[in-house]
C-alpha cells in the first residue's frame, strides 16, 4: 500500500495545486461547483455513483457519492466541505505554492488538502480491491464556513445511515486528530430607546447604548459563573449615529460555546431571560439566536474507533494523538446523532483562515496510509 501511495505523491501535489487555485468562497457558487466537478470526475472513475445537490434558497452545491446502493447503511461516511473563507480573487493574489516541506495557498489547509486526502484514500482502496468489501459514502458541502445552514439537515440525513464518520478537517501539528469539539452558536441583542439632544435635553432620551453596556456586563458575569462548561462573549457592538445624539438603537452580537449537551439549556434560558431584566428606563430589549451546533462529545464507539487508529498507526511507526478544541465543524452534527466520529483526517497544517495558512507535505503519505489501513481493517472485520 505504501509503495503505491509513494508513487502517487506528484499526482497528489498536482491535484492540490488544481483545487487550491479554484476560488471557492462560500458565496462563490460557481467556484464550489468547479471543485465538486473535479471530485465527481475522479469518484466516477473508481465506481462511485455521484450526485450534485443544490440546497437552500441560494442553491448551495453539495456533493454526495457512494459505492453501494442508495438507502443502505454505509460502513464509513467521509465528510468535508468545498468552500473556503477567502474572497473571490484571492487565488490571483497568492496562488498555490510549495517547497520541499510546505504548501500554501487559499484553503490549502482548510480544507482543500483534506478533500484530496479523502479522494486519494478512496483511490488507494480501489487499487487494493477493498471497495468491493466496504461501503463508503461521501458528503462534501459548500456552506460549512458560513454555518452549514443549507446543508445541516442533508448532513444529518446521511449520517443517520452511517456506522462511522471520518471528518477531513485539518490534522493538527504533531499529528493530532480531533475527538472533541465545543458546540457553538450566536445571539443578537437589539436595544431600542429614545433619541434626544445629548447636550440640551439628554433626560428626554432613553440610551440604547447604555442598555447594551449593562447587558454586556451581565453576559460577562454569566460567563464567569458558567464554570467552563459554557462561554458567552460579546464580540461586536454597534450603536449611535452622531456624538451629540442619545442613541435610540444599539446592537450586540454574542459568540456562544458549550462543552456538553447538558450546557445548552442553561445558555438558552439565560439569553431568553434578558429582555425581562433591562436597566435603562424606556429601553426595550429583544434577543434572537440559538446554539446552532451541538457539541461533539466522544462516546464509547468513538473511543473504540480511536483505538483502531492508534493500533494501525503504531504498526506504521507513526505517533498520533488527539485533542479537544473550541472550534466547530460539521462533525458536530454527526456526533450528536450518536455516530462514532473522528475529525482531523486532513493534512497536518495550521494557520487556517489566515494568509499564511499551510500544510506539511510530509504528512501526505502517512495520513493517506493510516486512513486507508483503518478502512481496510474495517472491511476485514466484516467477513
State each model region's role.
Residues 1-106, 127, 131-132, 331:
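Acidic/His- and Gly-rich active-site-bordering loop/insert found
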Residues 7, 24, 54, 170-171, ...:
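Metal-dependent amide/peptide-bond hydrolase catalytic core
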Residues 75-77, 103, 163-167, 188, ...:
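Short glycine-aspartate micro-motif
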Residues 79-80, 139-141, 166-169, 190-192, ...:
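Short beta-strand segments
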Residues 86, 102-116, 197:
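Glycine/serine-rich anion-binding loops at beta->alpha junctions
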Residues 111-182, 379, 383:
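Acidic/histidine-rich catalytic neighborhood of metal-dependent amide-processing enzymes
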Amino acid at each position: 500500500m505504501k509503495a503505491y501511495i509513494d508513487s502517487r505523491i506528484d499526482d497528489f501535489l498536482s491535484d492540490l495545486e488544481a483545487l487550491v487555485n479554484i476560488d471557492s468562497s462560500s458565496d462563490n457558487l460557481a467556484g464550489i461547483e468547479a471543485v465538486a466537478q473535479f471530485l465527481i470526475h475522479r469518484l466516477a472513475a473508481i465506481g462511485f455513483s455521484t450526485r450534485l445537490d443544490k440546497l437552500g434558497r441560494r442553491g448551495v452545491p453539495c456533493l454526495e457519492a457512494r459505492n453501494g446502493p442508495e438507502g443502505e447503511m454505509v460502513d464509513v461516511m467521509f465528510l468535508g466541505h468545498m468552500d473556503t473563507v477567502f474572497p473571490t480573487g484571492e487565488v490571483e493574489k497568492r496562488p498555490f505554492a510549495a517547497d520541499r516541506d510546505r504548501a500554501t495557498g487559499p484553503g490549502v489547509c482548510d480544507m482543500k488538502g483534506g478533500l484530496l486526502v479523502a479522494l486519494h484514500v478512496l483511490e488507494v482502496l480501489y487499487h487494493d480491491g477493498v471497495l468491493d468489501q466496504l461501503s463508503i459514502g461521501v458528503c462534501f458541502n459548500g456552506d460549512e464556513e458560513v454555518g452549514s445552514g443549507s446543508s445541516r439537515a442533508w448532513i444529518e440525513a446521511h449520517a443517520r445511515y452511517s456506522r462511522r464518520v471520518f471528518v477531513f478537517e485539518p490534522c493538527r501539528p504533531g499529528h493530532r486528530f480531533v475527538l472533541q469539539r465545543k458546540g457553538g452558536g450566536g445571539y443578537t441583542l437589539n436595544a431600542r430607546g429614545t433619541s434626544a439632544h445629548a447636550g440640551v435635553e439628554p433626560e428626554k432620551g432613553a440610551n440604547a447604548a447604555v442598555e447594551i453596556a449593562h447587558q454586556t456586563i451581565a453576559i460577562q458575569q454569566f460567563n464567569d459563573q458558567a464554570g467552563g462548561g459554557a462561554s458567552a462573549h460579546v464580540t461586536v457592538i454597534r450603536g449611535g449615529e452622531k456624538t451629540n445624539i442619545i442613541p435610540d438603537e444599539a446592537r450586540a452580537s454574542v459568540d456562544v460555546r458549550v462543552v456538553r449537551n447538558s450546557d445548552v439549556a442553561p445558555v438558552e434560558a439565560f439569553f431568553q431571560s434578558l429582555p425581562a431584566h433591562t436597566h435603562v428606563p424606556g429601553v426595550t430589549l429583544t434577543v434572537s439566536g440559538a446554539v446552532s451546533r451541538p457539541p461533539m462529545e466522544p462516546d464509547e464507539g468513538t473511543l473504540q474507533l480511536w483505538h483502531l487508529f492508534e493500533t494501525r498507526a503504531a504498526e506504521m511507526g507513526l505517533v498520533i494523538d488527539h485533542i479537544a478544541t473550541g472550534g466547530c465543524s460539521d462533525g458536530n452534527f454527526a456526533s450528536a446523532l450518536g455516530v462514532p466520529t473522528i475529525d482531523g483526517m486532513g493534512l497536518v497544517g495550521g494557520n487556517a483562515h489566515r494568509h499564511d495558512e499551510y500544510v506539511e507535505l510530509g504528512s501526505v503519505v502517512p495520513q493517506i496510509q493510516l486512513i486507508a489501513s483503518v478502512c481496510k481493517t474495517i472491511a476485514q472485520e466484516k467477513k
